[in-house]
């Protein structure tokens, strides 16, 4: 079995499996569970009546029985499949262009030579993954195809090299997940330039955790941009159905650190699970921004030394290499722990996340795949690589 087949099998299993560490249940889930138990009992009673036999099940027959899939498990599995379809749809443009170019190479070259690798590097450059990542992937492919230079092997080696270059051979990918933990106040700060979808992403993230049953508070600490707080208020009222709470300043240009202080105080006193902090997006004045972030960090660390648990930089995927520059600049003024890559559904060059990971060692944590409130998803490198390469690995045409 080749690498791509193994990766696809892993993704399929992951999509179908039910995680054991499920977050706390909301009231609807609890009600569903109760109804489900009642239905199971009723079915068992009916079975006994029909057979007119009370059969005692031995431990052996119990082992042989197929486990009943609970309603909650079924809902989770269906949600996971729905998320995978969203990612696949969001990557159609990137996958189409990438697969089309790889297929052109497969028709032109039957075996790999220096000229082939030059053209392969040109194709990789077009994905916006950056020159450093391009050379890394190209060199990995060369090493993996020394003995077998057939194009079938080259394609599989390309998929493995893309995966290996991003994950450093970590098959579990655990270190790339959002650092959210139970039984603590999780504090996440979002940074990024105006226009990238920072405030929208924050609202969607609030919805993401509120839907899982967590108590979420937002600190509107972008006191510089007119309309930033109003945007959050509108989101909370009209699209989040007031499921989350907000702490805001009394006036424009107020000290953002004071908003953070008030938010932390409220979050601690009222036992919130998550505090999301919106920040100003003006990178042009790095001195002021750095001072603001340092002041916020001091206030946060007075309460929790390990916080903020995430500093997430929001990057617009359609900006290409300009997004890489933004990541470089923000990493100078903030301890960025992860990337939220927005507008993945609007770009035909989906490699910017690979470029940032290679250049700055900052992983993608979440991706925006549409305009709906639930279109912010946890990033999964398995999904990304499978969908990016499925067009040329399966031999099927990827539709636009």
From Swiss-Prot:
For the region Disordered, give the residue spans: 12-37, 51-86
Instruction: List this protein's GO terms for biological process.
Output: SRP-dependent cotranslational protein targeting to membrane
Task: Report residues binding GTP.
Answer: 192-199, 278-282, 342-345
How is the protein disposed in the membrane?
Answer: Peripheral membrane protein
Query: Where is there biased composition of kind Basic and acidic residues?
Result: 51-72
Instruction: List where in the cell it is found.
Output: Cell membrane; Cytoplasm
Q: Which domain of life is it from?
A: Bacteria
Q: Which GO terms describe its cellular component?
A: cytoplasm; plasma membrane
What's one GO MF term for it?
Answer: signal recognition particle binding
For this UniProt record, the keywords arranged alphabetically read as follows:
Cell membrane, Cytoplasm, GTP-binding, Hydrolase, Membrane, Nucleotide-binding, Receptor
Give the reaction(s) catalysed: GTP + H2O = GDP + phosphate + H(+)
E.C. numbers: 3.6.5.4
Q: Which Pfam families match?
A: SRP54 (PF00448), SRP54_N (PF02881)
Question: Any idea what job this protein has?
Answer: Involved in targeting and insertion of nascent membrane proteins into the cytoplasmic membrane. Acts as a receptor for the complex formed by the signal recognition particle (SRP) and the ribosome-nascent chain (RNC).
Self-association state and partner proteins as the record states: Part of the signal recognition particle protein translocation system, which is composed of SRP and FtsY.
Q: Which NCBIfam families match?
A: ftsY
Indicate the family of this protein: Belongs to the GTP-binding SRP family. FtsY subfamily.
Query: What protein name applies here?
Result: Signal recognition particle receptor FtsY
Native source species? Mycoplasma mycoides subsp. mycoides SC (strain CCUG 32753 / NCTC 10114 / PG1)
